[in-house]
């Protein structure tokens, strides 16, 4: 389980096909504190650590995850929102996030709104009815409040802190994000 509060902005170090896809991710986490078998949310999906070294860890990504998330489009150098699994007794600053992505949403617009940016998304039709005004969504693993809903579309506001510490700082119209 996760909170949707990103604690590191990692970078894909390498991608290798070995049956499943092995992805190495650079991180500022102290990898001495990461156990093999630990769960880390990587831009939304919960992935299992299978290897690690100083400043990086590796995960294996199944064909199912590649097909149903944005991870199939990752390349070396891509930025990745990272969150370690929550621990009992820690602050729940976002909302409860499972790391089981429901689908992929596409950014249809991004416009300034005060000091934030309003991102509008198009959600998969079979999932859109579950998105509620003032409810919570996790987009690329980031816990956000839904500020508008219309048809299959919904909007969220991204404050400057979120832009600076997540991949929302580089996302643009046409980009796709993992939706939970």
Located regions from the model:
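Conserved loop->alpha-helix
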Residues: 1-180
């Amino acid at each position: 389980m996760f909170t949707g509060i990103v604690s590191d902005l990692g970078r894909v170090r390498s991608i290798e096909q070995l049956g499943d896809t092995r992805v190495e991710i650079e991180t500022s986490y102290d990898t001495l504190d990461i156990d093999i078998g630990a769960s880390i949310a990587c831009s939304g999906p919960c992935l299992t650590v299978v290897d690690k070294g100083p400043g990086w860890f590796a995960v294996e990504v199944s064909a199912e995850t590649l097909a149903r998330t944005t991870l199939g489009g990752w390349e070396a150098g891509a930025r990745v929102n990272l969150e370690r699994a929550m621990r009992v007794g820690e602050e729940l600053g976002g909302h409860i996030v499972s790391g089981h992505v429901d689908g992929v949403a596409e950014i249809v617009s991004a416009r300034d709104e005060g000091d934030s940016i309003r991102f509008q998304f198009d959600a998969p039709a079979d999932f859109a009815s579950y998105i509620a005004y003032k409810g919570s969504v996790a987009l690329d693993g980031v816990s956000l409040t839904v500020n508008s809903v219309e048809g299959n579309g919904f909007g969220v506001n991204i404050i400057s802190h979120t832009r600076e510490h997540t991949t929302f700082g580089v996302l643009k119209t046409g980009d796709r994000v993992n939706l939970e």
